[in-house]
Design a protein with these regions (language model features):
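Phosphate- and divalent-cation-binding pockets in alpha/beta enzyme and binding domains
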Residues: 45-46, 112, 335
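A short, structured surface patch at a secondary-structure boundary
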Residues: 3, 7-96, 100-107
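Bacterial Sec-exported substrate-binding components of ABC uptake systems
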Residues: 1-44, 154-183, 190-193, 210-222, ...
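Short hairpin/turn module used for nucleic-acid contact or packing/dimerization
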Residues: 300-360
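Conserved alpha-helical elements of sugar-nucleotide-dependent glycosyltransferases
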Residues: 42-43, 236-239, 332
Length: 360
């Protein structure tokens, strides 16, 4: 695999590596699978992308599914909701007689749900695409679904196109934006074009002798909102940090070399907000009123641009960003690039975004 670290795919064998203990789960495919239960909506997106949504016979949390085709099949009684790992419908799962149930684990501890399924004779295969750090690493799981369904060639060609698109966008941006400068975009810049910016300190000149020739600086991004009293900042090597970096930004407070998020207080986030040009993914909030209502301290966060990945949220609360977004990181990257360009120019671009909205 080019990007995926927790997956190996052969012609008739798929090996998934558990990141918690290094154990391997193997799925051998001697013929295309005809009936699949998906415990994650991202699995549905991969099957949808290769035109195999019809093999899905069961899902976990139908209300959270974004796929229009899958929802239509659910409404028609062709797909069933099998519950959650904490409250599964074992009788329904067994009755569906799936060729495989695609699951996931969130720790090294043995899952009573998965153990029970195995004892009932249900074939289970665990996947960890949600723990891949590289956006293309998550998208590369389409190859596994291609092998499952006999559409490996299609899956390979789709992934090649996705990776090519993503890498071209990232390279164009990287060619323009590379080195740190202290000038804050969106607050102090007065031109739509930043190509004439000069190094802002002697430090810039020493660290980057070519800074005189560099154009735009990286957009400084505040991420997320607190859950309870804890605010989680993505690690510098995490999925979201890679997307933001490839789009020309940097996440404030992200720890370099780390994939895991780190916890900070709201007060610490407020200090970071003073440097921020943009605020991304503020939870469920779709307006500044929502933000102010969620935490009175947010009224003091004077960040010029706020965007959330909630454009494609279902009535049941599912978010397509975490469904089809896994298959289409190049679309997310385009959204972020458009947002960062808008931050520089001060223009509104909400209508041209696919996964994001502007929080006003």
């Amino acid at each position: 695999m080019e990007y995926a670290a927790l997956l190996r795919v052969g012609e008739d064998e798929i090996i998934s590596v558990c990141p918690f203990d290094g154990t391997e789960d193997t799925l051998r495919v001697t013929e295309p699978l005809g009936k699949v239960i998906c415990m994650s909506t991202s699995h549905i997106a991969f099957l949808d992308a290769i035109g195999c949504d019809s093999v899905v016979c069961g899902v976990s949390g139908a209300a959270y599914v974004s796929s229009r085709m899958l929802r239509e099949r659910f409404d028609a009684g062709l797909v069933y909701d099998v519950g959650y790992d904490q409250a599964p419908d074992y009788e329904r799962i067994v009755a569906l007689q799936p060729d495989v149930l695609l699951a996931y684990r969130v720790s090294a501890a043995e899952s009573p749900f998965l153990a029970k399924l195995s004892s009932l004779g249900v074939r289970v295969f665990t996947l960890y695409e949600f723990l891949e750090d590289h956006p293309l690493g998550r998208a590369e799981y389409i190859k596994a679904f291609g092998t499952m369904t006999g559409r490996r060639s299609l899956a390979d060609s789709l992934f090649a196109a996705i990776a090519n698109d993503y890498n071209l966008i990232a390279k164009r941006i990287d060619d323009q934006i590379d080195y740190p400068q202290s000038k804050k975009i969106g607050v102090h810049a007065h031109s739509d074009s930043l190509s004439g910016l000069k190094p802002n300190s002697e430090y810039d000149r020493k660290v980057n002798p070519k800074a005189e020739n560099k154009g735009p600086v990286r957009i400084k991004v505040l991420m997320n909102i607190p859950y309870g009293d804890v605010w989680y900042v993505p690690g510098g090597e995490s999925y979201m940090a890679r997307l933001v970096r490839d789009a020309g930004g940097e996440i404030l407070g992200a720890k370099e070399g780390e994939s895991q998020s780190r916890a900070i207080t709201v007060e610490e986030a407020y200090v970071l907000s003073k440097e921020a040009d943009c605020w991304l993914n503020p939870g469920w909030c779709r307006s500044r009123r929502d933000l102010d209502a969620s935490n009175p301290m947010f009224k003091n966060f004077r960040i010029p641009a706020i965007y959330n990945n909630t454009r494609r949220v279902t009535s049941g609360g599912g978010n397509d960003f975490w469904e089809s977004g896994y298959v289409n990181p190049q679309v997310i990257l385009k959204d972020l690039r458009t947002i960062f360009d808008a931050v520089k120019s001060g223009k509104s671009v909400s209508d041209s975004l696919y996964y994001y909205i502007e929080v006003k």
